[in-house]
Regions:
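Carbohydrate-interacting regions of secretory-pathway proteins
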Residues: 1-225
Length: 225
């Protein structure tokens, strides 16, 4: 099983090719609107988010957006960049009724952070981009400099999760295993017995601090293991 993706062809931002559509990909951001995304409690105009210049931007700290659709087994790809000192994250299988604070404590977070300038990234190797926040570190720290777009991919298949960053598989883990439990029991979330137990729900992207920009967000469902 490879750990490196083939080089992406030049693409038109926020569009899918006929081949991608045939392969089951769905666009989650059209470059023009918030269509397909809500705030918590299905709020149609999420606080702290806007669309400008073909980018979906979280411009105010402490806000989250969730997909209108729910997913169980899926593959998600997106490109992102950060303002200096910013901190965000991606979550999956999230109920629509949770606040950002509740989402942060609900299940695994694929960390997105300024690895160079945000102090939290220096606290632990499980706090850097591509980590499962405070639980598992990535094999590599390969985020691009501030102002450049990164390409992230997450694959969720049952209890098996993969994190990819800029074409490299940086982390592969399985929920509800001895290794997972050992790391979880040493984490900030160890008192939460329901952490990571959900099998279906919304995909959520949080802007916890600063500002982040997103584009080319796409998802496809597949049958799990």
């Amino acid at each position: 099983e490879g750990t490196v993706e083939p080089t992406n062809l030049v693409r038109v931002d926020n569009n899918l090719s006929e081949e991608e559509l045939k392969d089951g990909w769905q666009l989650l951001f059209d470059g023009k609107s918030m269509s397909g995304w809500n705030g918590t409690n299905s709020k149609k105009e999420p606080d702290g988010w806007e669309v400008a210049d073909g980018l979906l931007s979280g411009f105010a700290s402490g806000n989250v957006i969730l997909t209108e659709s729910v997913y169980d087994n899926f593959e998600l790809e997106f490109e992102w960049k950060l303002k200096k000192g910013a901190d965000g994250g991606l979550f999956f299988h999230v109920p629509s009724t949770l606040s950002l604070t509740e989402i942060l404590n609900f299940g695994p977070e694929m960390q997105i952070i300024d690895d160079q300038y945000h102090p939290d990234a220096a606290v632990s190797n499980s706090h850097v981009t591509g980590a499962v926040y405070d639980i598992l570190p990535p094999r590599y720290v390969i985020s691009k400099p501030i102002g450049e777009f990164n390409h992230s991919r997450i694959v969720v298949s049952g209890n098996n999760i993969e994190h990819w960053l800029n074409g490299i598989k940086t982390l592969k883990y399985e929920l509800n295993t001895d290794i997972w439990s050992q790391n979880f029991n040493n984490s900030l979330f160890r008192e939460n017995s329901n952490f990571g137990k959900s099998q279906s729900g919304h995909i959520a992207i949080a802007n916890q601090e600063g500002q982040l920009w997103l584009k080319n967000i796409r998802v496809r469902n597949f049958l799990g293991q």
